[in-house]
Amino acid sequence: AVSGGPDSMAILDFLSNNHKVTAYYFDHGTHFGKESYSFLRDYCARKDIPFVASVLSAEKPKGKSLEEHWRDERYEKFHDYNLPIVTGHNLDDVIEWFLFSSLHGKGKIIPYRNRNVIRPFLSTPKKSLLDWCERKKVPFLTDPGNDDKKFMRSVIRHDMMPHAQVVNPGIQKTFKKLVEREYNLLY
């Protein structure tokens, strides 16, 4: 699954150089979706990677945030494909998701595997994926929604994470150990 961001572009680059893959893109119906769709379609055409896109419904049910609605729709589509789906979720996402789910009374970490969805970068810091893209000259887009504070994830990323890192400068190492222990990952 690709969004055009550095995480998914790093994994697409890595996998497409070593395996036969298809890039799956989910358009959330935002203005940025049109830009990322064109970017990904063109990138995949240049690299000879099959490209499949789906448009998700922007109408959310009552009682759900837009983020939750989009995530639920994406995963429903993932399961419809009934093929292994690899995502670029990384260690920074694990920490953000833990904080997000803790604020909602759940306190879970992102599962390494969920049915047909596999997340091999869960113990990899986002910076490593950015470094990969820079080293390999892999282009990527930055979604302006990542800075939009109407989304809880942006508040966590830009407001809470800097404070968490002051309280525990080794927070990434702490969560890396948690992920590796939880999923018995050997790196």
Predicted regions and their residues:
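Core alpha/beta nucleotide-donor-binding catalytic domains of modification enzymes
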Residues: A1-H158
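ATP/NTP-dependent adenylation/nucleotidyl-transfer catalytic domains that generate, transfer
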Residues: K150-Y187
